[in-house]
Every structure is written in structure tokens, then in C-alpha cells.
């Protein structure tokens, strides 16, 4: 069982290591934190922390650095403390959507870069899966005698366009009729939607085109992976350069692979989650990922991740993500 003094020393070692990136000795701790105890007492407490596997020796110094277990203990305490704090939530994404005329891709790109600037680490923002999204509007526009453009507008502000060839002899009145019906009645329950279409459309070409449009919408949404927007990749590279150059390539490969998508898709709560080193992947030991959710609206949510070295300013990052609605 860790004592109050040992916890204070562990906190000091973690925070000093984050700030200075150097092993910490007993005299340094006393000097920086104005501890009213002898170096011998500090050394004894550090020995106890080492036996608990919370701190460890390095090959190049007589000082100690926090281990993954020590950082995990420190982070768990932080999460416990912040879970009881009420925060004034900031609806920054809503502001960015308005500023960018509801162009959600631009808004999310700017959101990722803003979070990176505030946290000073790399950030990932994942667009909500369209299967969670609601189609607000469907439009059918005839481009020429054979080409029709299908436009889908989602509640998140995202817009999808599909160009397709159709030889149906339908004018704009017919196309608007189909589009308006689908806007009002579209459902992922295919059986119910098909029944509604068949009971509503008496003209064969309207019926065929309506079913064709539904097929295209389902195919388009089903094939889409969640878009990921990254901000501050260079900040991650710079941070890793200072600690372990050899770890940069596997970390970047992980971030750019499906593994990071799978990790983020597992987030189902707005609570802050922190994964450290090999908790993320057996091949990783130098980064931490702090994740949470953000809101497009009351029901539609996406994921946020802040990625940095294991010697991360966790308190700043957790407070930042706690304030995002």
C-alpha cells in the first residue's frame, strides 16, 4: 500500500520527468519541491517505490524515472480527481461549423489543429459513422439526358454526391417527387422502406428509380469508413525525437493503420480514457493515447484522441478534453 508521502514523491517524479525529461534524484526532489525531509529519507522512500515497480533506474544516471506502472498509477489518481469536477463545456465544434458554413470536413480539420495547438501534442478527430447520422435531405438533379446526381445531406452537415447513369424517362417533377418521398421516409429498415415505396409509386419508372436510389444510399453508407482528421503530427515526431528516435516509424505506422481506427471505434463513453505504452499495442512503449468523445449534436458523437509521449502533460490534456462538449 502506497503511503501519502510516497504518493507525493511519485507525483513529483512523474511531473519533473514530464517537464525536464531527465532522471530525478533525491536532492533534486528536495530542492525543487521544498520537501522538509532528509535526502536519506527520500532515498528510502524511492527505494520502496522502486520495489513497487513505480519507478526504475536508468543506465546513464543514478536518478530514477517513472515506469509505465508508475505513470499508470499517477494517471488513475488524476482521472479519479477530475471525474468529480464540474467543467464548463465548450461547444467549439458548433462554432467551427457555423464559421465554415457547415462544411464538416473543414470544421473537423480545424478542430483537430486547434486541439493540437492547445494540447501541444498530435490529435486525431474521428467523424461520426454515417450509420449513426441522420439523412436530412435527399436531392435528385438531372445533369443531362442520361446522368443524374444524387445528393445526400446529413444532420452533421456532411454532404455526399453520387453520379449515376439512368435511362429512365423521368423529368424534374418526377425526380423531385422521388427525392421528397425518400427525404421524408428513408429508413435503414429495408423491408419497411420497400413496402412504402411500392405503395406510394404507381409509375413503374418512378418505382424502379426509387429502389435504385435506396440501393445506392445503403451501399455508399455501408462502404464508408470513418474519416480521421489529424493535427500536429510534427509535434509527435519532435517529442519522440527527444526521447527515442527508433520508435517513430512503428508509432506512425500504427497511427496510419486500421488499428488506431479500431481502438477509437471502441470508445462508447464520453469519459476520458488513457492508454499508456503497451496497453495500446505490444509493439509500442513510448506513446500514450488519451481519448474521449465530442458531440455534433445531442445524439451524434465522434471520437477525439490526443497522442504524445508517455511523459505527457496528462493533467493539461485531461482538463482540455473534459471541457469539450
Curated annotation (Swiss-Prot):
Pfam families for this protein: HrcA (PF01628)
GO biological process: negative regulation of DNA-templated transcription
Function statement: Negative regulator of class I heat shock genes (grpE-dnaK-dnaJ and groELS operons). Prevents heat-shock induction of these operons.
The keyword Repressor belongs to this UniProt entry's keyword annotation: yes
GO molecular function: DNA binding
Gene3D superfamilies: 3.30.450.40, Heat-inducible transcription repressor hrca homolog, domain 3, Winged helix-like DNA-binding domain superfamily/Winged helix DNA-binding domain
Full protein name: Heat-inducible transcription repressor HrcA
Database matches in InterPro entries: GAF-like_dom_sf (IPR029016), HrcA (IPR002571), HrcA_C (IPR021153), WH-like_DNA-bd_sf (IPR036388), WH_DNA-bd_sf (IPR036390), WHTH_transcript_rep_HrcA_IDD (IPR023120)
Presence of the UniProt keyword Secreted in the record: no
Keywords: Repressor, Stress response, Transcription, Transcription regulation
Family stated for the protein in its record: Belongs to the HrcA family.
Domain of life, source organism: Bacteria
Source organism (scientific name): Staphylococcus epidermidis (strain ATCC 35984 / DSM 28319 / BCRC 17069 / CCUG 31568 / BM 3577 / RP62A)
Amino acid at each position: 500500500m502506497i503511503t501519502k508521502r510516497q504518493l507525493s514523491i511519485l507525483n513529483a517524479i512523474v511531473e519533473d520527468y514530464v517537464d525536464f525529461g531527465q532522471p530525478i534524484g533525491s536532492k533534486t526532489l528536495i530542492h525543487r519541491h521544498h520537501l522538509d525531509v532528509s535526502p536519506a529519507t527520500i532515498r528510502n522512500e524511492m527505494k520502496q517505490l522502486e520495489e513497487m515497480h513505480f519507478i526504475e533506474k536508468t543506465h546513464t544516471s543514478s536518478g530514477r524515472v517513472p515506469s509505465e506502472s508508475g505513470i499508470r498509477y499517477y494517471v488513475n489518481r488524476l482521472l479519479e480527481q477530475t471525474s468529480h469536477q464540474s467543467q464548463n463545456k465548450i461547444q467549439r465544434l458548433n462554432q467551427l461549423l457555423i464559421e465554415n458554413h457547415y462544411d464538416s470536413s473543414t470544421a473537423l480539420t480545424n478542430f483537430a489543429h486547434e486541439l493540437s495547438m492547445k494540447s501541444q501534442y498530435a490529435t486525431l478527430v474521428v467523424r461520426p459513422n454515417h450509420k449513426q447520422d441522420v439523412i436530412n435531405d435527399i436531392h435528385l438533379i438531372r445533369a443531362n439526358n442520361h446522368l443524374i446526381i444524387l445528393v445526400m445531406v446529413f444532420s452533421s452537415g456532411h454532404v455526399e454526391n453520387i453520379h449515376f447513369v439512368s435511362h429512365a424517362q423521368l423529368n424534374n417533377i418526377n425526380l423531385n417527387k422521388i427525392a421528397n418521398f425518400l427525404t421524408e421516409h428513408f429508413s435503414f429498415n429495408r423491408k419497411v422502406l420497400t413496402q412504402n415505396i411500392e405503395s406510394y409509386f404507381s409509375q413503374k419508372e418512378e418505382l424502379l428509380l426509387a429502389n435504385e436510389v435506396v440501393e445506392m444510399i445503403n451501399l455508399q453508407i455501408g462502404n464508408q469508413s470513418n474519416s480521421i482528421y489529424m493535427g500536429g503530427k510534427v509535434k509527435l515526431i519532435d517529442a519522440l525525437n527527444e526521447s527515442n528516435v527508433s520508435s517513430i516509424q512503428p508509432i506512425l505506422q500504427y497511427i496510419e493503420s486500421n488499428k488506431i481506427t479500431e481502438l477509437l471505434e471502441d470508445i462508447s463513453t464520453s469519459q476520458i480514457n488513457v492508454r499508456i505504452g503497451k496497453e495500446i499495442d505490444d509493439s509500442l512503449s513510448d506513446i500514450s493515447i488519451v481519448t474521449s468523445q465530442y458531440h455534433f449534436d445531442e445524439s451524434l458523437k465522434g471520437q477525439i484522441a490526443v497522442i504524445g509521449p508517455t511523459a505527457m502533460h496528462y493533467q493539461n490534456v485531461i482538463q482540455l478534453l473534459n471541457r469539450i462538449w
